[in-house]
Each structure stands twice: as structure tokens, then as C-alpha cells.
A protein has these predicted regions:
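N-terminal, polar/charged subdomain of small-to-medium soluble alpha/beta proteins
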Residues: 1-130, 134
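Short beta-strand-to-loop capping motifs
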Residues: 40-42, 134, 184-187, 224-227
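Flexible, gly/pro- and Lys/Arg-enriched active-site loops
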Residues: 43-48, 127, 170-177, 200-291
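Short, surface-exposed acidic-centric catalytic microdomains
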Residues: 48-60, 151-190
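Short amphipathic alpha-helices in soluble, non-transmembrane regions
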Residues: 53, 145-150, 194-201
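Short secondary-structure junctions
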Residues: 90-98, 151-158, 205
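N-terminal beta1-alpha1 ligand-phosphate binding loop
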Residues: 125-153, 162-166
């Protein structure tokens, strides 16, 4: 019987700091001691075999990031402090695939006897793919700006993206051609929060769309989220028609030919059996796109 391999872990335990986080005025003036514990989940086998720091993470660098947050600008809630630590660590150390952050107030201003008041959060990194499309305004600029927003966004990291492809419209054909691409991100947002963030990017970049198949300034579709299958009023993942459309499969295949759909077929296999005869033209090579 095949058993799923457990994650290797690194522990940064009982890190003590003095900070000014809290809701009460006295906490922000006088400060108090805090204790932080981190559990990092990542593959340590290669580091162990090669005895090479480049194959793991630098504890000192992580400690310094935590210290700057704990001794830096005051936050009202421990929840906020913990989230900022998770964000900073996961953004800067791509080898980490799971992270537990515990932040404790050892002398919280609460009557009674206790060891500490603490918040603990867990964030796991998931790979997701996003389809990008535009056929209004400066289409190339729209996709470029969308990629920049993904690269700079909270709780995710842009890992890869395809070239930009010129494609003919589907459904309502009396409109300009589309420019399409696919991006790969690693995120610790939930699927719902990731969808909300994509909609924020669309709105920020002035999305205009008056009908379902009509022209739009920018369209961002969540194609998949890890290995999850989600069917809800707001979200269907994997995207229900992604494997029927050349404008999705061609750029998707460029960056993830071996991604496996829940049906058991890979992107490459879907592309090989695609019946969509829509013309796809390479418009902007990947090497011409700078993020």
C-alpha cells in the first residue's frame, strides 16, 4: 500500500520579542513581551543528502523577518501579526509549502492566571492556473498589467506565464479578436478569496463587459486550484469548459503540459484531441514579456 509521504519540518521555536501590538492604548505605549513559534513544511531530503544550504531555507533570514514585524509598526490584533508573518515568509521562501505561525502574548492585560494568550494560523501553498483574456483597448498592455498585479498581489506569487496568443471570439463573433494567456501562481488564499482577488484586478484595470460572450477589457478565469474540485454558486473548478477551448489549452499547454484534469487526462492529451478549429496565432513571445 502506498502511503502519502509526510512533510519534513523545520521548527523555529520560542522566539522572544518585545513589541507594541494590541488594542489597548497601554499596550501601544508600554509594550509587552511576545513569543513566536514557526513550523515550516518543505522537502529537506536534498539538503540532507548534499549538506547544502541552498537546498533548504536560511533560519537567520526568517528570524530577521519575524523580528522586524514583531518589533515594528504596532497592530491591533494578533491575527494581523500572524498573517503578516505568514505573508512575509511564504513570499520570500518558495521552498516552503506549508507554514504554522503561533504568536503569543505572555502578559496580556487580562485579569486572571494564564501562561499566554495566543493565535495560531496554518497556511498551505497551492498551485493554481489563471486564464487571461482581453479584446478592448490596448490588449497587450491589459494582460501585462494583469500579470504585474498577480506578481505584486497579496498571499500569492506569480511563478510562470505563457506567451500572448491572438484568438478569434467565441459565441458572439461580431467583435475584435482576443489576446489570451495563462499564468501559474502559488497561493495561500482560499479558492473563494483568490476569485475575489481576481475580480478586484479586473475592476482595478477598468473591466468592461456588457454581455456574456461580448467584448471585455480584461477577463481573469480561475482554471484550477490544486487538485480540488469545487462546484458552488460562485465558482466551478476546474473551469467547466477549459478543455474545449484552444484559446485556453494552447497557452495552458505551453506552461503546464502535464497538468492532470480530474478526468485523468493531461493538458497535452486534451490538446491533442481538441476539436476546436479556432485559429491561434502567437502574438507576443514569452521572452518579450517583462514582469
Amino acid at each position: 500500500m502506498n502511503q502519502q509521504r509526510q512533510s519534513d519540518r523545520i521548527y523555529l521555536s520560542a522566539m522572544d520579542f518585545y513589541g507594541y501590538h494590541g488594542v489597548l492604548e497601554a499596550e501601544r505605549i508600554l509594550g509587552q513581551p511576545f513569543q513566536v513559534d514557526l513550523t515550516l513544511e518543505l522537502d529537506l531530503q536534498r539538503a540532507g543528502l548534499l549538506d547544502d544550504l541552498n537546498e533548504t531555507v536560511n533560519y537567520a533570514q526568517i528570524y530577521e523577518q519575524v523580528r522586524q514585524i514583531m518589533e515594528g509598526e504596532p497592530r491591533a490584533l494578533l491575527e494581523k501579526v500572524a498573517e503578516e508573518i505568514a505573508e512575509e515568509v511564504l513570499k520570500n521562501f518558495s521552498k516552503i509549502k506549508g507554514l504554522t505561525v503561533k504568536v503569543a502574548k505572555q502578559k496580556a492585560p487580562i485579569p486572571g492566571h494564564f501562561q499566554a494568550m495566543a493565535v495560531e494560523i496554518y497556511r498551505t501553498v497551492t498551485k493554481a492556473y489563471i486564464g487571461l483574456g482581453s479584446n478592448l483597448g490596448n490588449k497587450e498592455e491589459n494582460l501585462q498589467k494583469a500579470l504585474e498585479c498577480l506578481n505584486d498581489g497579496p498571499s500569492l506569487s506569480l511563478r510562470d506565464y505563457s506567451a500572448f496568443y491572438l484568438t478569434q471570439p467565441v459565441g458572439f463573433t461580431e467583435q475584435d479578436a482576443f489576446l489570451n494567456a495563462v499564468a501559474e501562481v502559488e497561493t495561500w488564499l482560499t479558492p473563494e478569496e483568490l476569485l475575489r482577488f481576481l475580480q478586484e484586478i479586473e475592476n482595478k484595470l477598468g473591466r468592461l463587459r456588457k454581455e456574456r460572450w461580448g467584448p471585455r477589457t480584461l477577463d481573469l478565469d480561475l482554471l484550477n486550484y490544486g487538485n480540488e474540485t469545487i462546484i458552488s454558486e460562485k465558482l466551478i473548478v476546474p473551469h467547466e469548459r477549459m478543455y474545449e477551448r484552444a484559446f485556453v489549452l494552447v497557452p495552458f499547454h505551453e506552461i503546464a503540459p502535464h497538468w492532470i484534469h480530474p478526468s485523468g487526462l493531461s493538458t497535452k492529451q486534451y490538446l491533442e484531441q481538441l476539436e476546436d478549429e479556432q485559429a491561434i496565432v502567437l502574438q507576443v513571445p514569452k521572452e518579450s514579456i517583462t514582469i
